[in-house]
Amino acid sequence: MKMKLIQPFIQSIRFRIVGLLLLCLIPPTLGGIFLIDSYTGRQLKKIAEQDLQSRARLIIQLISRSDRERQQSTAFVASQPAIVEFNVEASQYFLNEFIKFHQWNGFFVVANQEGELVAGSDGANQEKGLPLKHWFEEVKDKNRHLNRLFPGKTYAESKDCLIVPIHSKNDQTQIGIVVECIPLPVIADFVQKILKDAELERILLVNYEGYIYADTDFKNYGVLENKKKSPLVNRLLNDQSGFVYSQGKFSYLSPVHLRGAKTWGLIVENSESDIQAAILNVNRIGYLLVLVIGGIVAYASWMVIHHSTVPILDLTKASQAIAAGDLDYEININQGNRQDEIGILGNSFIYMKNQIKTLIAQEVKDGVNRLELEKGRQIQQNFLPISLPDLQQWQINAVFEPARSVSGDFYDAFLLGDDYLAIVIGDVCDKGVGAAMFMGLFRSLLRVFSGETMPGDTCIRDVNYKCSANDGNGKKKVIVQFLNAVRLTNDYIATEHGDMAMFATLFFGVIDISNGNLSYINAGHEPVFILNSEGIKHRLKSTGPAVGMMPNSTFTIDSLKIDPGEMLIGYTDGVTDARSPTKEFFGRQRLMETLTANFSAKTEILDIIKQELIGHIDGSIQFDDITMIAVYRN
C-alpha cells in the first residue's frame, strides 16, 4: 500500500497544535486586554494629572519670574539719581523713557515722605485716590518693598501696585517711595497668553485676599470679584493642593507663594475627553494586537513549532535568570552556529546581556561619583557660616558661588570676645570631597585655636608670651594669640596629615572693632585690598607660606588701620581666574577697576562683582568656586 505523504489539512498535527494554541491564547488575551484597559485608564489618568501638575508648576515659574523681574525693574527705578533727588523734570523724563523702552503696560508714581506726588509717568496724574502717605508708612515700617491691590469701581480700573522705598544716598534713610501699578486686564492678557502656550482650557489666578486677578473663562470682566468664600479658593488660600473632577473636566489646585511668602492660588483646568480618547485608542490597538498576534502565532507554530520552541524556551529561562539578577547565566542558544533568525536572536540576546552588565557597572560608577560630589557639596555648605556678625559700626557681606564640582573655597567671620572681629578667606588645594573635608578641618581648627570657642575673658597662652590683664601689651599679645591659630593649624595639618599633601592658602585678619586696627597673616593667598572712595589704598600681600605645607613655618603678622569709610575686600583665585567663552581671564586688574568704580555700593559691591563675573563667563563652564568677603567700616 502506497504511503500517503500529504495529510488532509484538518487532520494535521500542526493544525491541531495551532488551533489549541489559539484557543489557549485568545480568551486570556481578551481578559488581559480588559485588565490592561482598566490599568491603562488609571495610568493615563495619573499621567494626565502629572502633566497638568507639571504645567501648573511651569506657569508658577513664569508668574514668579515675571514678578521678580518687575520687582528688580522697580528697584532699579528707585535707585536712579533723578528719582532719589526728587528732580521733577528729570524724573518724569526718565519714567516715560523707561516705560517706552521696556514697553511697560503700567505707570510709575514718585512720592515724598509726606505722601505728596513728586513726579509720575504720562497718565499717572489721572490716577486718584492712591494712598501714597499710607503706603510710605507701611514700607518704612516693614523696611522692604510691598505689593498692594488698588481696587477700582470695575475690574478694568483695578490695579496691582508695587511700592519700593527710595533711600537717600548718604545715610540710606527712606525719603520716599516709587509706586508702579499695572492694570489687572494686563495681567489677565498675560495669563491668556500662557493659557494658549500651555494648551489648557482654563487658568484662574487669585491673590492672597481671594480677589480674582485673571480667569480665562471670562472674556469681559465686570466688577472685581472676591472668591475667598468659594470652597476651591478657600482650599488654595489655606495652602492645600489637589485634583478636582467635575462635569467632564479635571482641575489642579496649586497654592503659589509670592511676595513675602504670601499664599496666592492657581487653578488650571483641562477636559477629560482627551483621556477617554486615549483609552479608546489603547482598546483599538489592543484588539488589533490580538488579531496580529494570533496570526503570527498560528503561522509561526505551523512553520517552526518544533524547531523554534526549544531555543525560545531556553531564551525564556535566560531572560528570567537575567531578570532575577543572574547576569552570568550561560546562554547556549547558538552552540551549533545557527545562521537563522533564532541564531541571530541568540547572539543579540548575548550581546544585550553583556551590554546590560556594562551599563549597570557604569551606572554604579556614575552613581558613586554623583554621591561623592553631592556629599562634598553638602559638606561645603554645612561648614560655611549660617549668618555673619551684625555690628553697629561695621558692615559684613560674603558671596559664595560653587562650581559644578566641589572644591575647597571657604570664608568665615566671627567675634573673638566682645572686642575683636575675625575675618577668614581661604582656598584648599585640589578639588573633590577630600578638599571639601579639609576645608571643614581648616575652618574648625582656626576657630578653635583662635579661642573663638573660649569665654571672652580667657587668655590662651602662647609659648612665647604670658598674657596678663595688667600687661601694657596685653591687647597686642591677645591679638598675637588669635593669629597664632594659623601657626597651630599649619603644624597640626603638616604633622598629622602631611602624607595627604593637602594645604590651603588663606588670609586671617583680626580687627579691633573699636578703633579699626587690623592685624593679619596672609598665608600665600591672593592679595587682600583695602580701598576707599579714591581707590585701592593697600594691597595686603603674602606674609608667609601656605598653611599645612611644612611644620614650624614662619608666619609674619602685619598690621594697619581701617579708617571710617574704608573697606576690606578678600577673594579667591576663582574670581580672577574666571574664563570667558574665548578663554580670557577676568583678571586682577579688572577686579580692581570694578572695585574702584563701585565703591559707593559698600559691601553690596560683591553682588556687582558677581554680576560682572556672570557676564564675563557668559554660560561657559565655571572651573572653580567664586568666593568673596567684604568688611566696611561706617
UniProtKB/Swiss-Prot annotation:
It comes from the Bacteria. One of its GO terms (cellular component) is membrane. One of its GO terms (biological process) is signal transduction. Residues 306-361 form the HAMP domain. CDD domains: HAMP (cd06225). Keywords: Hydrolase. One of its GO terms (molecular function) is phosphatase activity. Involved in cross-regulation of inorganic carbon and glucose metabolisms. This is Protein IcfG. It comes from Synechocystis sp. (strain ATCC 27184 / PCC 6803 / Kazusa).
